[in-house]
């Protein structure tokens, strides 16, 4: 699992960005090295996804303002909301299926338009 931060710069995320960039490099290397063995490798780069981590972060860092901050974070996405874990899972399931048998060495942004539509 990669992240959109490997596509766009985000303040104060040096180590996280570097590790997600490494996931991309690993994805491409595995795809190239094992293509003749029938092994496919792709990466998925989500943007903000509404998980319990987000709720916990907001409650710890913005007590009493969780709803306001959640709304603010959601509005940074061009679609106006965070992704849902099931949406990420559906993409991963597709990439693992035979229906995606012609896809390898690719990264898939699943970000509500964040990378391409935010002017980054």
Q: PLM features: what roles do these ranges have?
A:
Residues 32-36, 101:
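Alpha-helical segment proximal to the catalytic Tyr-Lys
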Residues 3:
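Residue(s) in the substrate-gating loop at a strand-loop-helix junction
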Residues 8, 93, 104-120:
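Short C-terminal tail/terminal secondary-structure segment
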Residues 46-56, 60:
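Short, flexible catalytic-loop segment of classical short-chain dehydrogenase/reductase
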């Amino acid at each position: 699992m990669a992240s959109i931060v490997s596509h766009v710069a985000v303040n104060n995320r040096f180590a996280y960005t570097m590790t997600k960039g490494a996931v991309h490099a690993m994805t491409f290397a595995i795809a190239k090295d094992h293509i003749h063995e029938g092994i496919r490798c792709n990466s998925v780069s989500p943007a903000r996804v509404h998980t319990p981590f987000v709720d916990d972060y907001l409650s710890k860092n913005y007590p009493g303002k969780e709803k306001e901050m959640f709304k603010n974070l959601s509005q940074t996405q061009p679609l106006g909301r965070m992704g849902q874990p099931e949406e990420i899972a559906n993409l991963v399931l597709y990439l693992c299926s035979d229906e995606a048998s012609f896809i390898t060495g690719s990264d898939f942004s699943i970000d509500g338009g964040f990378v391409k539509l935010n002017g980054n």
